[in-house]
């Protein structure tokens, strides 16, 4: 044992073994860590009832899924709808469903039936999970003074623990290309004091005119007012949960305005996109020292002729690097793409991809040129100093 620091562990059911050998286990563990089973209804309460003097931490909680840019209005449970390899044939959903926290469907009928063509992608409405939503998990963590916190699984998407044709699962709140998913902004609304509003989904839904789309907002403001094409759909007070509007789709602009003490303090908006026309390049830095190990990260969006991002675009892009720069890798965040990271081309996923560069030993101007079929070519200059 370590006399200087509290000792913990992550366990599927850490109370097993304590029931008959409590004192021995307590000699080694100061804080009891709960993995997946800690997400189930009544599990943590049962622990606290039996061991009221011990504190706990959720070491692998919650397990929720999202694929960036993908939405489904009806709830999906992993064990029922997309079982992991080790669950296939081993789990009877009817016997398991009473142990999960309910996540109501957002609509009676699926708003995005076309997404059924992509069974390895999960919805970004916080309605694809193993046992509990991210929202409910945090509410529960906050309500138990003897529960120190939670470490969600996972923070980033990661290679492995997935079945062909996937290279990674969809556990993260940031995808494998380091692009935030919607859940990232849920946690931001819970943990930051800076006023913020996040709106989902995007507002490019061709063929769905007049059909009801669930619009979800995360915020830390007092209230949010929603607008479609500058017409107010009303405001709703924030009470610690997500805000939901059911909105008949009409192309144009959707905007959420966060209000504190009667003033607009944060906004978020989307504009309906037309056909892909060009690319937009955004770099984390525009100058770098020669021979540096710094990484230049360039996020690329497919845009229409008005510069509006195209959220369904899947154009193939090619990258040419000249001057004192070299290509480190490319990625698009798609969990089912198996391309080599070092190749100088990439198919965008849900309108985006990322290019990573690094400087050579020489000084001068380096250039990244991005090209795509029927797209306007773009160049980005990086000063190597």
Predicted feature residues:
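Extended substrate-binding grooves/exosites of carbohydrate-active enzymes
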Residues: 1-237, 244-249, 253-263
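Extracellular Ig-like/FN3 beta-sandwich strand-entry sites
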Residues: 249-253, 295, 363-365
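Low-complexity, acidic Ser/Thr/Pro/Gly-rich terminal tails and inter-domain linkers that flank the onset
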Residues: 273-291
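Short, hydrophobic beta-strand segments
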Residues: 244-249, 341-361
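Beta-strand-rich structural segments
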Residues: 215-219, 257, 293-311, 317, ...
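Edge beta-strands of extracellular beta-sandwich domains
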Residues: 263-274, 376-384
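Short aromatic-acidic-glycine turn motif
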Residues: 277-281, 319-336
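Short, solvent-exposed loop/linker segments at the N-terminal edge
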Residues: 205-210, 287-296
């Amino acid at each position: 044992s370590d006399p200087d620091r509290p000792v913990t562990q992550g366990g599927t059911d850490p109370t097993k073994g304590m029931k008959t050998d409590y004192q021995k286990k307590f000699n080694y563990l100061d804080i009891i860590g709960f993995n997946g089973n800690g997400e189930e209804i009544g599990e943590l309460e049962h622990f606290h009832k039996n061991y009221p003097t011990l504190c706990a931490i959720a070491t692998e909680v919650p397990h929720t899924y999202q694929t960036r840019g993908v939405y489904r209005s009806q709830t999906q449970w992993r064990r029922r709808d997309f079982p992991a390899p080790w669950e296939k044939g081993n789990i009877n959903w009817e016997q398991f469903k009473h142990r999960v926290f309910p996540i109501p469907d957002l609509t009676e009928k699926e708003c995005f039936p076309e997404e059924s063509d992509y069974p390895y992608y999960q919805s970004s409405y916080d309605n694809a999970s193993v046992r509990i939503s991210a929202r409910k998990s945090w509410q529960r963590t906050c309500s138990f003074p003897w529960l120190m916190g939670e470490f969600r699984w996972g923070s980033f998407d990661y290679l492995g623990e997935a079945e062909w044709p996937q290279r990674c699962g969809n556990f993260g709140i940031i995808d494998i290309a380091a692009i935030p998913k919607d859940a990232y902004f849920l946690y931001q609304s819970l943990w930051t004091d800076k006023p913020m509003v996040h709106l989902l989904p995007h507002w490019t839904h061709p063929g769905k005119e007049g059909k009801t789309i669930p619009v979800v907002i995360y915020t830390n403001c007092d209230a949010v007012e929603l607008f479609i094409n500058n017409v107010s759909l009303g405001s709703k007070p924030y009470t610690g949960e997500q805000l939901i509007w059911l909105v008949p789709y009409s192309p144009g602009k959707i905007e959420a305005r966060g209000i504190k003490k009667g003033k607009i303090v944060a906004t978020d908006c989307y504009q309906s996109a037309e056909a892909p026309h060009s690319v937009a390049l955004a770099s984390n830095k525009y100058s770098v020292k020669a021979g540096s190990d710094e990484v230049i990260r360039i996020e690329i969006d497919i845009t229409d002729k008005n510069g509006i991002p195209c959220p369904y675009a899947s154009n193939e892009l090619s990258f040419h690097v000249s001057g004192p720069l070299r290509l480190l890798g490319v990625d698009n965040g798609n969990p089912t793409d198996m391309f080599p990271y070092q190749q100088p081309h990439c198919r965008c996923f849900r309108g985006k991809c990322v290019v990573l560069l690094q400087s050579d030993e020489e000084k001068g101007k380096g250039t990244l040129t991005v090209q795509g079929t029927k797209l306007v070519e773009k160049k980005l200059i990086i000063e190597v100093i």
